[in-house]
Amino acid sequence: MRRFFTTLLLLPVYFYKYCISLMTPASCRYTPTCSEYAVQALKKYGPVKGLYLAVKRILRCHPWGGSGYDPVP
């Protein structure tokens, strides 16, 4: 069941990563990018904690937020 929900949450991330982000300029302030971070977090921690970490990271990614290398814990 965990794998099903993880895959379900990865689908919109992959859609964004391979369809939408190709049409927009790179704007993520972090390495790895927020979409790659979300993929890594969901695969490593599953749907609950992975989604929490991904949302937390996306909310930090703005002009007044931090920048630089920020790996999945």
UniProtKB/Swiss-Prot annotation:
Primary localization: membrane
Family the UniProt entry places it in: Belongs to the UPF0161 family.
One Pfam family it belongs to: YidD
One annotated Gene Ontology cellular component of this protein: plasma membrane
Membrane topology annotation: Peripheral membrane protein
Keyword terms of this UniProt record: Cell inner membrane, Cell membrane, Membrane
Gene source species: Parabacteroides distasonis (strain ATCC 8503 / DSM 20701 / CIP 104284 / JCM 5825 / NCTC 11152)
Protein name: Putative membrane protein insertion efficiency factor
Its job: Could be involved in insertion of integral membrane proteins into the membrane.
Cell inner membrane recorded as keyword: yes
HAMAP family: UPF0161_YidD
